[in-house]
């Protein structure tokens, strides 16, 4: 009878407390009085936690994927101004995905943001229809993000200046080589109080040397600009598969105050979704550098994948690449923080994701298998989109050459030589090998 009672008690406890009472844990089962006291404390603790945090399933989540979110962040934002109006500049694969995320949040937090989100579209014909009209009637970007339903409060606009009219927050999400032309058109039409976030990956080379794209926006438009970057393949985010990202933003000197201006809490509400978790930090330089240079490393991973060299070679490329990313940041942007590269989604996590798939790996793999050039591969594979590593490796080479430091970054230089000077991919190991043997 004793054995039966113990088994029954174990079975009951396993069902009610499966984590605490495994068969191994049952060997040190607490007494009945201890168990009751512990259960009472757990119940009281749970009641206190639920009193402070209202957790509910989000309406966009599928029933079989019950991601939950906390509304506690909303309660601490008390707006002392009109709701923020948001415009997304760019409507490609990633631009449309971010616009979807933002539009879901502006509708959800309509006391913080104006629900309608404008998305500037470089208009083009899809058959006999304009892409803008298709987005606004069918609520899908059939060219760059097909089969993904977009919120009805997301409005496509082919007129750049009209799309930003009255906007308080601009989100740049275009191929970075087009940024100078876009900024030139915006000059004189953006008020000083406007804030911006750059989702672009790359650098601007000019009279000021190598420059972060967020800094370029600030200098050219006179507005504060942060950055967003992370381990985010657009199709997965668009399908609401769980992922995380990093937003970096520094409060400007003309910050208007809590509840009157964009800050970390506002940005969290703008970008955070149940399927898209956001961490907001100050290190704009760190996440921008990592976001740009990971695409160069991804090209190298694509080369070795296309040659069939396997996972060991890819891992070696990623190790060397991470080292050169950190070195580049410390050398040219000393304000960047080393911990950003390994603590944030925008760092090593983004590097791993990008080197495992995405446009740059796809293009480089195709180059290795077919012998075609980078631009030919990009044109044939990407449906009008860009592999940013192709341009970034040239920008990095030009800057390092100006500084006479190309030998300090052998992986970046090797990628440039393969892409632009037709150096044999098979020579990659010799080009990046670190020799510690002294000549005698």
UniProtKB/Swiss-Prot annotation:
A Pfam family annotated for this UniProt entry: NAD_Gly3P_dh_C
Substrates-to-products reaction catalysed: sn-glycerol 3-phosphate + NAD(+) = dihydroxyacetone phosphate + NADH + H(+)
KW Nucleus (keyword) present: no
Sorted UniProt keywords: Cytoplasm, Mitochondrion, NAD, Oxidoreductase, Phosphoprotein, Transit peptide
Induction text: By anaerobic growth conditions and other conditions leading to accumulation of cytosolic NADH.
Residues making up the signal peptide according to the UniProt record: none
Transit peptide: 1-16
Record EC number: 1.1.1.8
CC per GO annotation: cytosol; mitochondrion; nucleus
Known function: Catalyzes the production of glycerol under anaerobic growth conditions. Glycerol production serves as a redox sink by consuming the excess cytosolic NADH during anaerobic metabolism.
Record's protein name: Glycerol-3-phosphate dehydrogenase [NAD(+)] 2, mitochondrial
């Amino acid at each position: 009878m004793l054995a039966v009672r113990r088994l029954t008690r174990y079975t009951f406890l396993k069902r009610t407390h499966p984590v605490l009472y495994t068969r191994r844990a049952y060997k040190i089962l607490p007494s009945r009085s201890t168990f009751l006291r512990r259960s009472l404390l757990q119940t009281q603790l749970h009641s206190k936690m639920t009193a402070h945090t209202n957790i509910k399933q989000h309406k966009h989540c599928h029933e079989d994927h019950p991601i939950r979110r906390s509304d506690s962040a909303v309660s601490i934002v008390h707006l002392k101004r009109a709701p923020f109006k948001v415009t997304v500049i760019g409507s490609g694969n990633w631009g449309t995905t971010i616009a979807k995320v933002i539009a879901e949040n502006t509708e959800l937090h309509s006391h913080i943001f104006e629900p309608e989100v404008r998305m500037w579209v470089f208009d083009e014909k899809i058959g006999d229809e304009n892409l803008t009209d298709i987005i606004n009637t069918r609520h899908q970007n059939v060219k760059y993000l097909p089969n993904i339903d977009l919120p009805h409060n997301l409005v496509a606009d082919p007129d750049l200046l009209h799309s930003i009219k009255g906007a308080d927050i601009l989100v740049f999400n275009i191929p970075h080589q087009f940024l100078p032309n876009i900024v030139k058109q915006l000059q004189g039409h953006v008020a000083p109080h406007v804030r911006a976030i750059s989702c672009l990956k790359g650098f601007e080379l000019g009279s000021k040397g190598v420059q972060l794209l967020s800094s370029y926006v600030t200098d050219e438009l006179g507005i504060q600009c942060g950055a967003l970057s992370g381990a985010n393949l657009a199709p997965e985010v668009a399908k609401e598969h769980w992922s995380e990202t990093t937003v970096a933003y520094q409060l400007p000197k003309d910050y208007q105050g809590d509840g009157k201006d964009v800050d970390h809490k506002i940005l969290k509400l703008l970008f955070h979704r149940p399927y898209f978790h956001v961490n907001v930090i100050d290190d704009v330089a760190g996440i921008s550098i990592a976001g740009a240079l990971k695409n160069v490393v991804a090209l190298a991973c694509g080369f070795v994948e296309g040659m069939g060299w396997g996972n060991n070679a890819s891992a070696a490329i990623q190790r060397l690449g991470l080292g050169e990313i950190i070195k580049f940041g410390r050398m040219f942007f000393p304000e960047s923080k080393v911990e950003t590269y390994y603590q944030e989604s925008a760092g090593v996590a983004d590097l791993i994701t990008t080197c495992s798939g995405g446009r740059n790996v796809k293009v480089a793999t195709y180059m290795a298998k077919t012998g075609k050039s980078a631009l030919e591969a990009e044109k044939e594979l990407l449906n009008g989109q860009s592999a940013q590593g192709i341009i970034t490796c040239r920008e990095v080479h030009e800057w390092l050459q100006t500084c006479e430091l190309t030998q300090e970054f052998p992986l970046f230089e090797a990628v440039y030589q393969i892409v632009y000077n037709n150096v044999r991919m098979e020579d990659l190991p010799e080009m990046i090998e670190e020799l510690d043997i002294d000549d005698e």
